[in-house]
Amino acid sequence: RNNIALILNSNSEDIIFTSGSSESISIVFNKLSDNFKPENIVISEVEHQATIISSNILKKRGWKIIEWEVDNKGIVNLDKLENYLNPKTKLISIIWGQSEIGSLQPIQLIGKKCKENNILFHVDATQIISNGIFKWKDLNCDLLSLSAHKFGGPKGIGILLTNEKSRSILRNSDIALTHEYSIRQGTQSLPLICGMHQALKNISGLITFSNYDTVFKNNKIIFLKDYLINLLKDNKYVEITGSIENRLPNHLSFILLNKNFLPIKAYKIINFMSDNNISISSGSSCSSSNKNPSKVLTKLRLDNNKLFSNIRLSFGEQNSIDQLDKFHTLLLQCIEKF
């Protein structure tokens, strides 16, 4: 715990070991419900299923869940923020980097406003930390969720980062638990924690932030995303989804049109690429079996015929320019083929 705290520039007591981000989010929402009478919780329109599920549970307990509107790039409308900064709002929970469309939220500004108004602020940073280490003490947030398997660590382990304010709310008041500062029950898995620590040590790069921007310094793969964007941005058959500027450095998503300018179903492109030894996806792996349109894409106000056509690429240090050139060549074939 101390070694992880040194990496993340936190105090050791800030670190709560969990099974991953989904459990961390569940702890935040459930403990909030245990300690406050039902009032308001604000989440964005493009949250991960883990946040949506926890929100729906609290809705059944009488809480009002307010979905913060996003623009057509998936970024929250900051003009709406002042509407939520009132005593009835007990929690604002925002996903930092969106897994389906890659857009980054201005969490530092949101957190600053929450702090000024004594509102608890939680950040889902599951997709972020593989791209660089941030300094917890510099972030304007009270709670932050991480999963080790997203940054090269083992499955089944994660972190809920806290501060003194949030721990006082999350702590179990009925019984003093011996583990995790009376916030989470159960014995810690030392092998998983050690694996997560090693994965954190292996992360290169640094994440810094201003009110509006997240900056990834010394990131080894951002050039791959930029290279592919340059290949695609002037192609009239490609519609990039999410923000180009404020985007995860290891992520690109888009809709591909055929030569008649009709959207090509994602599964056709995925299968074609798979036949050519390239793995891509159409959305969040946690909702891959869902036959309904992606909620995230519907919130971008896309035409209905495009809701099943979003393609998502994830880049890693093992990828190369040659692979992207091959992918681009095959993509051009898809335009003609489908």
Pin down the residues of each PLM region:
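Pyridoxal 5′-phosphate
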Residues: 1-338
